[in-house]
Protein backbone atom coordinates (compact mmCIF):
# COMPACT_ATOMS: atom_id res chain seq x y z
CA UNK A 1 0.00 0.00 0.00
CA UNK A 2 1.39 3.34 -1.01
CA UNK A 3 -0.03 6.83 -0.71
CA UNK A 4 1.96 9.95 -1.54
CA UNK A 5 0.43 13.29 -0.57
CA UNK A 6 1.78 16.36 -2.33
CA UNK A 7 1.29 19.52 -0.32
CA UNK A 8 2.40 23.10 -0.79
CA UNK A 9 1.33 26.55 -1.84
CA UNK A 10 -0.63 27.26 -5.01
CA UNK A 11 1.70 27.45 -7.96
CA UNK A 12 4.22 25.02 -6.43
CA UNK A 13 3.37 22.44 -9.10
CA UNK A 14 1.49 19.84 -7.04
CA UNK A 15 -0.86 18.76 -9.84
CA UNK A 16 1.70 18.80 -12.65
CA UNK A 17 4.34 17.00 -10.60
CA UNK A 18 1.74 14.62 -9.17
CA UNK A 19 0.56 13.41 -12.58
CA UNK A 20 4.09 12.74 -13.81
CA UNK A 21 5.19 11.17 -10.52
CA UNK A 22 2.17 8.84 -10.50
CA UNK A 23 2.91 7.76 -14.06
CA UNK A 24 6.60 7.11 -13.32
CA UNK A 25 5.76 5.15 -10.15
CA UNK A 26 2.88 3.30 -11.83
CA UNK A 27 0.39 4.70 -9.30
CA UNK A 28 -3.02 6.31 -9.72
CA UNK A 29 -3.38 10.08 -9.39
CA UNK A 30 -6.05 12.28 -7.88
CA UNK A 31 -6.26 16.02 -7.33
CA UNK A 32 -8.49 16.86 -4.36
CA UNK A 33 -9.63 20.19 -5.85
CA UNK A 34 -10.60 18.46 -9.11
CA UNK A 35 -12.38 15.73 -7.12
CA UNK A 36 -14.38 18.37 -5.20
CA UNK A 37 -15.26 20.24 -8.42
CA UNK A 38 -16.56 17.03 -9.99
CA UNK A 39 -18.48 15.93 -6.91
CA UNK A 40 -20.17 19.27 -6.28
CA UNK A 41 -20.39 20.41 -9.92
CA UNK A 42 -19.00 23.81 -8.90
CA UNK A 43 -15.72 25.65 -9.07
CA UNK A 44 -13.80 25.80 -5.79
CA UNK A 45 -14.15 29.58 -5.73
CA UNK A 46 -17.94 29.29 -6.14
CA UNK A 47 -18.16 26.86 -3.21
CA UNK A 48 -15.91 29.16 -1.18
CA UNK A 49 -17.98 32.25 -2.05
CA UNK A 50 -21.40 30.62 -1.73
CA UNK A 51 -20.86 28.35 1.25
CA UNK A 52 -18.05 30.15 3.08
CA UNK A 53 -14.56 29.02 4.01
CA UNK A 54 -15.64 26.91 7.00
CA UNK A 55 -18.04 24.83 4.86
CA UNK A 56 -15.45 24.47 2.10
CA UNK A 57 -12.81 23.27 4.57
CA UNK A 58 -15.28 20.67 5.94
CA UNK A 59 -15.95 19.45 2.38
CA UNK A 60 -12.20 19.29 1.78
CA UNK A 61 -11.71 17.27 4.98
CA UNK A 62 -14.51 14.86 4.07
CA UNK A 63 -13.08 14.32 0.57
CA UNK A 64 -9.58 13.72 1.98
CA UNK A 65 -10.96 11.10 4.39
CA UNK A 66 -12.92 9.45 1.58
CA UNK A 67 -9.87 9.27 -0.69
CA UNK A 68 -7.79 7.72 2.11
CA UNK A 69 -10.49 5.14 2.86
CA UNK A 70 -11.07 4.16 -0.78
CA UNK A 71 -7.68 4.38 -2.52
CA UNK A 72 -4.24 2.91 -2.11
CA UNK A 73 -1.25 3.08 -4.44
CA UNK A 74 -1.97 6.66 -5.35
CA UNK A 75 -0.40 10.10 -5.59
CA UNK A 76 -2.72 12.75 -4.12
CA UNK A 77 -2.35 16.42 -4.94
CA UNK A 78 -4.03 18.43 -2.19
CA UNK A 79 -5.37 21.96 -2.13
CA UNK A 80 -2.91 24.50 -0.76
CA UNK A 81 -4.90 24.95 2.45
CA UNK A 82 -5.76 21.30 3.06
CA UNK A 83 -2.92 20.57 5.54
CA UNK A 84 -3.76 23.66 7.59
CA UNK A 85 -7.23 22.72 8.86
CA UNK A 86 -8.64 20.24 11.35
CA UNK A 87 -6.25 17.29 11.73
CA UNK A 88 -5.65 16.88 8.00
CA UNK A 89 -1.86 17.00 8.24
CA UNK A 90 -1.81 14.36 10.99
CA UNK A 91 -4.20 12.21 8.96
CA UNK A 92 -2.03 12.45 5.84
CA UNK A 93 1.17 11.72 7.78
CA UNK A 94 -0.49 8.66 9.36
CA UNK A 95 -1.84 7.43 6.01
CA UNK A 96 1.15 7.79 3.71
CA UNK A 97 4.18 9.84 2.75
CA UNK A 98 3.71 13.60 2.74
CA UNK A 99 5.87 15.70 0.44
CA UNK A 100 6.02 19.47 0.84
CA UNK A 101 6.87 20.98 -2.53
CA UNK A 102 8.62 24.07 -1.22
CA UNK A 103 9.25 26.89 -3.67
CA UNK A 104 10.77 30.30 -3.04
CA UNK A 105 8.51 33.32 -2.70
CA UNK A 106 10.04 34.67 -5.91
CA UNK A 107 9.27 31.50 -7.88
CA UNK A 108 5.72 31.25 -6.50
CA UNK A 109 5.10 34.92 -7.26
CA UNK A 110 6.43 34.54 -10.81
CA UNK A 111 4.26 31.48 -11.46
CA UNK A 112 1.16 33.07 -9.96
CA UNK A 113 1.60 36.25 -12.00
CA UNK A 114 1.70 34.05 -15.11
CA UNK A 115 -1.47 32.18 -14.14
CA UNK A 116 -3.39 34.86 -12.28
CA UNK A 117 -6.41 34.68 -14.63
CA UNK A 118 -7.01 31.14 -13.38
CA UNK A 119 -6.66 32.09 -9.71
CA UNK A 120 -9.61 34.20 -8.55
CA UNK A 121 -7.98 35.13 -5.24
CA UNK A 122 -5.22 37.01 -7.06
CA UNK A 123 -6.66 37.93 -10.46
CA UNK A 124 -7.09 41.61 -9.57
CA UNK A 125 -3.79 41.99 -7.74
CA UNK A 126 -0.63 43.69 -9.01
CA UNK A 127 2.65 41.71 -9.07
CA UNK A 128 3.72 43.44 -5.84
CA UNK A 129 0.38 42.64 -4.17
CA UNK A 130 0.68 39.01 -5.28
CA UNK A 131 4.12 38.80 -3.67
CA UNK A 132 2.80 40.10 -0.33
CA UNK A 133 -0.24 37.83 -0.59
CA UNK A 134 2.12 34.85 -0.94
CA UNK A 135 4.36 36.01 1.93
CA UNK A 136 1.40 36.52 4.30
CA UNK A 137 -0.13 33.14 3.49
CA UNK A 138 3.13 31.21 3.68
CA UNK A 139 3.87 32.59 7.14
CA UNK A 140 0.63 30.96 8.36
CA UNK A 141 0.84 27.76 6.34
CA UNK A 142 4.48 26.75 6.69
CA UNK A 143 3.87 25.65 10.27
CA UNK A 144 1.76 22.85 8.77
CA UNK A 145 3.69 22.30 5.53
CA UNK A 146 6.94 21.74 7.44
CA UNK A 147 5.37 18.75 9.23
CA UNK A 148 5.67 16.78 5.98
CA UNK A 149 7.77 13.61 5.91
CA UNK A 150 9.79 15.09 3.05
CA UNK A 151 10.49 18.74 2.30
CA UNK A 152 11.50 19.01 -1.35
CA UNK A 153 12.83 22.32 -2.63
CA UNK A 154 11.42 23.28 -6.01
CA UNK A 155 13.93 25.30 -7.97
CA UNK A 156 13.90 26.69 -11.47
CA UNK A 157 14.59 23.42 -13.21
CA UNK A 158 12.89 21.30 -15.82
CA UNK A 159 10.00 19.08 -14.80
CA UNK A 160 12.15 16.10 -15.71
CA UNK A 161 14.89 17.26 -13.32
CA UNK A 162 12.34 17.83 -10.55
CA UNK A 163 10.94 14.30 -10.93
CA UNK A 164 14.41 12.71 -11.17
CA UNK A 165 15.52 14.47 -7.98
CA UNK A 166 12.27 13.80 -6.10
CA UNK A 167 11.77 10.09 -6.86
CA UNK A 168 14.76 8.76 -4.86
CA UNK A 169 13.55 10.67 -1.78
CA UNK A 170 10.12 9.05 -1.73
Swiss-Prot record:
Keyword NAD among record annotations: no
CDD domains, per the entry: SK
Residues the entry annotates as binding ATP: 11-16, 119
Cofactor annotation comment: Binds 1 Mg(2+) ion per subunit.
MF (Gene Ontology): ATP binding; magnesium ion binding; shikimate kinase activity
Sequence positions that bind Mg(2+): 15
Classification via InterPro entries: P-loop_NTPase, Shikimate/glucono_kinase, Shikimate_kinase/TSH1
Amino-acid positions noted as binding substrate in the UniProt annotation, renumbered to this chain: 33, 57, 80, 141
Compartment(s) where it occurs, according to its Swiss-Prot or TrEMBL record: Cytoplasm
Top-tier EC class: transferase
Pathway involvement of the protein, from the record: Metabolic intermediate biosynthesis; chorismate biosynthesis; chorismate from D-erythrose 4-phosphate and phosphoenolpyruvate: step 5/7
UniProt keyword terms in alphabetical order: Amino-acid biosynthesis, Aromatic amino acid biosynthesis, ATP-binding, Cytoplasm, Kinase, Magnesium, Metal-binding, Nucleotide-binding, Transferase
Catalysed transformations (reactions): shikimate + ATP = 3-phosphoshikimate + ADP + H(+)
Any one of the GO BP annotations: aromatic amino acid family biosynthetic process
Primary localization class, coarse: cytoplasm
Cofactor: Mg(2+)
Enzyme Commission code: 2.7.1.71
HAMAP family, A to Z: Shikimate_kinase
Subunit annotation: Monomer.
NCBIfam families, sorted: PRK13949.1
Protein name (Swiss-Prot/TrEMBL): Shikimate kinase
The organism of origin for this protein: Azobacteroides pseudotrichonymphae genomovar. CFP2
Gene: aroK
Amino acid sequence: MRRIFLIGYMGAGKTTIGKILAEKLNLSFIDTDFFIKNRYKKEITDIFAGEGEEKFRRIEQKILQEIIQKWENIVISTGGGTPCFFHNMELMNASGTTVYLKATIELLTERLINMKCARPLIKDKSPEEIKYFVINNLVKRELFYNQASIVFFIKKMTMNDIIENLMPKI
